[in-house]
């Protein structure tokens, strides 16, 4: 693209780092809990929350992945919810609970008032709820390949002698 500055990835952010996207000032917020590396990126009146929060009727991300921690997740959610109430929150994904149409945007005010895992709950209540719920969840279907790519910082494995790249999937260990 002409006239657009590009950069070589990866770029690593620390909590509170500021950066620019075009003319927009942005802030990186470290929001661990789902995994240790989770980040929320605030851009103007919008925040991209990754797997920290879901839509209010979906609650929050699981915290039983490697390095996940329900207490950290609660603290991270509180950090996101400390943004102004009108801040638009964009979800990483949505499961459309109870047959609801898929949505991807809510606000801080909506989450505070209606999130089924957060609204009216103390930190200890959230940890108990999240821990109990996580014990009932199956391993995601793509967790093995996802971990292999994530552990390489998003890079795929090196190609074999034929130039093909492979992820390993155990057939008798799950």
Cite the ranges covered by each PLM segment.
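Short, small-residue-biased leader/transition segments that mark boundaries at the very start
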Residues: 1-9
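Glycine-rich, flexible loop/turn motifs
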Residues: 8, 15, 59-61, 104, ...
């Amino acid at each position: 693209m002409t006239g657009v500055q590009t950069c070589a990835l990866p770029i690593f952010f620390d909590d509170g780092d500021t950066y620019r996207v075009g003319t927009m000032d942005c802030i990186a917020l470290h929001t661990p809990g789902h995994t240790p590396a989770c980040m929320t990126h605030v851009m103007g009146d919008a925040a991209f929350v990754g797997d920290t929060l879901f839509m209010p009727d979906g609650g929050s991300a699981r915290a039983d992945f490697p390095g996940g921690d329900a207490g950290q997740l609660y603290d991270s959610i509180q950090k996101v919810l400390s943004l102004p109430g009108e801040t638009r929150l964009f979800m990483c994904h949505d499961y459309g609970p109870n047959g609801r149409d898929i949505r991807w945007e809510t606000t801080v005010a909506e989450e505070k008032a209606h999130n089924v895992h957060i609204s009216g709950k103390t930190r200890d209540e959230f940890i108990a709820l999240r821990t109990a719920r996580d014990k009932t969840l199956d391993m995601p279907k793509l967790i093995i390949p996802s971990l292999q790519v994530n552990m390489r910082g998003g890079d795929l494995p090196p190609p074999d002698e034929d130039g093909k790249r492979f992820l390993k999937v155990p057939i008798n260990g799950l």
